[in-house]
């Protein structure tokens, strides 16, 4: 039976239960030297769900999970699914104000959290949070310590042990279109929004990615360190379950240990953002590993520049695919295929998966013909239910026909492949002409002395907006701003050539790989390392 057919009527909890029934001894998770089977995750998730139910957590309650790449995150995800509750995955790196905002906005009744992360004591942080978050009833901690004097705080292992063999009831019918997760956007252009995703949507995205890379039970998957991200939830965790593959986890990304894991475990499928593959490429050149098992990689979150794409295929992973993903579409919108020619895999974001429809539209919503540049609009099973507690914002972005206005500019070619240009709000208007940052960035990335680059518009009295390039040079390389401008003039129209070039230590990016352009603007405004023009 085709994978898409198996998904009919399936929920997230049922996906794991089916896999654990058919292959209980199959290897699901590899964390350091710890191996966890599908049967073990099913048993622990069932026990944790029972323990949470005994505390009063019920269907529809929001459960925040604030963990790194660990088995406890995966167990928590499926426990929430079994309860019919709603998962709220959050980044442990969030500032106290960001974390408090998301916990309050989601109305989380319970939080599963790391105890210590990057020097931050989360037990201390939540002691401060409790009086400010009246909806928050319980805290479940993953670690060694325990606040024994607080009856609202429990250790993860204790709850799992307490729930073994305990029966729990879930009222109501679990439907694939029920709300399963509220995933917060990265907030690169404003306050984060809570995106409501269904069981069906996440499983659809998982299926699309699994089919694109040809996942099988023999595969070992790597590259979903940020488990709180929508790509990790769908293609990462659920895609692995649907295929019966194994998932190799890393608590925090580090290129040295990442390549060691790829070699040690014979990883065959690698997901990641461009910066991950770039860091691994540099490390592989420094100390080569045997990566002969690696057969395919999938890059999402942000486009990969042509030079890096070619180098990764030549030196790291023999076949790379590109995907277009958004939180609002449960991750995958379109994805390349292994049998696509290299030009399509490199310069496009592939084609929409089964059931997904893509239009390119004018500002008034009218559909444009192929090869026309406009705003990408998407509909299909992966589309969000809406923004949590923001009906006005939901109505603004989803039209009456059920298409999401993504804010991304691009086109569909005659073969149905998606070409991305950039975000609508990122377009620079220089003397009345539109300049798309992606086009200039691609040209800069092609220079051998440029490691990374991002382009923004800055206010200018004469030009309206000037084109400013922020550049990270290759270590040891010497290049000037004028050289880079001349390089751009070889292929770009005059109005697209950067008016200024500023060399900086690093490009600020979100975990998705997207440039944090507001932060970059502040750095450029401060003259970090001094402008070179």
Segments predicted by a language model, with ranges:
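ANL superfamily adenylate-forming
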Residues: 117-176, 283-284
């Amino acid at each position: 039976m085709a994978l898409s057919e198996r998904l009919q009527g399936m929920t997230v909890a049922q996906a794991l239960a089916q896999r654990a029934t058919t292959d209980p001894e199959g290897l699901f998770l590899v964390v350091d030297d710890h191996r966890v089977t599908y049967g073990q995750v099913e048993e622990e998730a069932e026990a944790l769900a029972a323990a949470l139910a005994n505390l009063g957590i019920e269907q529809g309650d929001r459960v925040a999970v604030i963990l790194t790449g660990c088995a406890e995150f995966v167990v928590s995800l499926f426990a929430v699914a079994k309860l019919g509750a709603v998962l709220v995955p959050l980044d442990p790196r969030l500032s106290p104000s960001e974390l408090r905002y998301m916990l309050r906005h989601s109305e989380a009744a319970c939080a599963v959290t790391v105890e210590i992360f990057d020097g931050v004591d989360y037990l201390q942080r939540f002691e401060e949070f409790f009086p400010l978050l009246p909806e928050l009833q319980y805290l479940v901690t993953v670690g060694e310590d325990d606040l024994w004097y607080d009856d609202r705080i429990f250790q993860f292992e204790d709850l799992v042990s307490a729930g073994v063999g305990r029966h729990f009831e879930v009222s109501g019918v679990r439907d694939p279109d029920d709300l399963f997760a509220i995933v917060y956007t990265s907030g690169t252009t404003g306050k984060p929004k809570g995106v409501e995703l269904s069981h069906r949507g996440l499983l659809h995205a998982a299926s699309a990615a699994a089919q694109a890379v040809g996942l099988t039970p023999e595969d070992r998957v790597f590259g979903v360190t940020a488990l709180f991200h929508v790509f990790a939830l769908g293609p990462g965790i659920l895609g692995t379950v649907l295929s019966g593959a194994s998932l190799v986890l890393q608590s925090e990304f580090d290129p040295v240990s990442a390549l060691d894991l790829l070699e040690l475990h014979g990883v065959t499928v690698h997901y990641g953002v461009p910066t991950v593959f770039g860091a691994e490429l540099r490390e592989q050149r420094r100390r080569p590993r045997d990566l002969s098992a690696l057969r395919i990689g999938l890059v999402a979150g942000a486009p990969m520049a042509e030079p890096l794409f070619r180098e990764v295929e030549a030196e790291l992973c023999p076949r790379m695919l590109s995907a277009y993903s958004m939180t609002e579409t449960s991750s995958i919108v379109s994805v390349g295929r292994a049998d696509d020619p290299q030009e399509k895999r490199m310069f496009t974001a592939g084609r929409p998966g089964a059931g997904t429809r893509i239009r390119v539209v004018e500002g008034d919503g009218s559909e444009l013909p192929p090869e026309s540049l406009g705003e990408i609009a998407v509909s299909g099973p992966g589309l969000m239910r809406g923004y949590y507690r923001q009906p006005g914002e939901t109505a603004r972005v989803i039209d009456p026909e059920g298409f999401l206005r993504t804010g991304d500019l691009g086109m569909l070619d005659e073969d149905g492949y998606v070409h991305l240009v950039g975000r609508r709000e990122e377009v620079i208007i220089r003397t009345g002409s539109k300049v798309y940052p992606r086009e200039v960035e691609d040209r800069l990335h092609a220079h051998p002395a440029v490691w990374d680059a991002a382009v923004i518009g800055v206010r200018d009295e004469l030009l309206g907006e000037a084109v400013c390039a922020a550049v990270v040079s290759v270590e040891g390389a010497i290049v000037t701003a004028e050289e880079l401008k001349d390089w751009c003039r070889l292929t770009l129209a005059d109005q697209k050539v950067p008016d200024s070039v500023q060399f900086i230590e690093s490009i600020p990016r979100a975990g998705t790989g997207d440039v944090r352009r507001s932060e970059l603007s502040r750095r450029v405004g401060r003259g970090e390392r001094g402008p070179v023009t």
